């Protein structure tokens, strides 16, 4: 038996049973991949007009700059004949499957630093403590089982910890705790406290849980 969500009626019959959500922290910019901006490329190197920048504050990293030039993509874009979408020459194979994917160009954030922008993308708010997208899906749609987490989290590590991610990105916020994601770790114990402690066999642990 599963755990039902709060949405009792759906507009469409669900087709997907599972979702794999990949978040590439520090990945290529969208204007280098899918977001074709010919006017920006044309004005590359020009100063940002006051009509665009307005009164927006700048980050501490840019405080010492006296010039704020526009920066367009250095890569060429090709328009897909069937979908009309544009793809840069960095992703030629992705362009070949343009009919099978959905590219959303209408999303934006006013965050000027990485961490608030990441939290906004994961939760819909720059303020910490809000439920993440996985928690909302668990809350709304439920889960096909009652004995496993609603969703799990895998973090990749390189030579340096460059991912600007923390538990806010998979936290349940003000929703019940069973809607929170469970982080898997590398090594012998991907989930803490599931392995039997030294000197305790499976039968003994079962008796403790049953008691």
Label the model's feature ranges.
Residues 1-211:
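Ligand-binding pockets and gating/stacking loops
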């Amino acid at each position: 038996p599963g755990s039902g969500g709060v949405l009792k009626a759906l507009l469409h019959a669900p087709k997907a049973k599972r979702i794999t959500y990949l978040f590439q922290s520090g990945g290529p910019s969208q204007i280098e991949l899918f977001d074709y901006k010919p006017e920006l490329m044309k004005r590359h190197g020009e100063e940002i007009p006051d009509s665009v920048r307005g009164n927006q504050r700048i980050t501490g990293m840019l405080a010492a700059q006296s010039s704020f030039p526009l920066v367009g993509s250095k890569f060429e874009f090709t328009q897909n004949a069937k979908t009309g979408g544009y793809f840069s020459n960095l992703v030629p194979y992705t362009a070949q499957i343009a009919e099978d994917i959905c590219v959303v160009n209408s999303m934006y954030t006013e965050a000027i630093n990485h961490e608030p922008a990441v939290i906004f993308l994961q939760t819909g708010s720059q303020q910490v403590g809000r439920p993440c997208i996985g928690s909302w899906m668990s809350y709304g749609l439920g889960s096909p089982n009652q004995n496993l987490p609603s969703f799990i989290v895998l973090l990749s590590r390189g030579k340096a910890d460059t991912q600007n991610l923390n538990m806010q990105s998979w936290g349940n916020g003000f929703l019940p705790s069973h809607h929170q994601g469970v982080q898997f770790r590398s090594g012998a114990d991907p989930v803490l406290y599931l392995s039997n402690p030294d000197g305790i066999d499976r039968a003994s642990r079962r008796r403790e849980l049953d008691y």
